[in-house]
Amino acid sequence: VAQKTENTIWSGTNANEGEFDGFTTTLLADADVVDVAAVGGGVNAANVVAQIGATVDSISQNVYGAEDLQIFVSSNVMRAYVRALGGFATNIGGAGTDNKGTQWYSGGAVTFDGIPLVLAPGLTANKMVAAEKSNLFFGTGLLSDQQEVKVLDMADIDGSQNVRIVMRYTAGIQHAIGSDIVLY
């Protein structure tokens, strides 16, 4: 449930049953959002620094330096960046700081030009979103007869040792100021 919700938050499409429009869908539809053209062939360890740099260079001067500015990146972008940090992408035989290899120790904080990179597993490959956290919203209805979570013990029904989970809920996302967001 958590992974499906994560995927829908970032990449959902209202036309798909059980989904709502995710940030990628709403940001693409907003003409005010700053769009950065993706590199042909996708992001990899050899070009990731330039691609994240293109995203950072497109951030509005009103937002750059904001306390809650973050760059949300897909799994392949984070993986490529971590690999590039160790020097392995440059083929110079680099082994990272103190020969410790790549730089993402125990899943700690990763930054680019001082801006936190946040792994967003729900983003599709080669996607990045630079935005203030306060400009991105997630909402759900909790006090309604349309909201329900149930665990059904199937032992009394069919004699099995199974449980079934029923979940019904509503959710959605929204952004406020499109011109303060960069979509790669």
Locations of the language-model features?
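Ordered core of a single globular domain
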Residues: 49-88
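Short, charged N-terminal helix-start/capping segments
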Residues: 1-3, 97
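Sequence/fold signature of self-assembling virion shell proteins
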Residues: 17-50, 82-184
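Short, glycine/acidic-rich hinge or "gate" loops at secondary-structure transitions
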Residues: 3-19
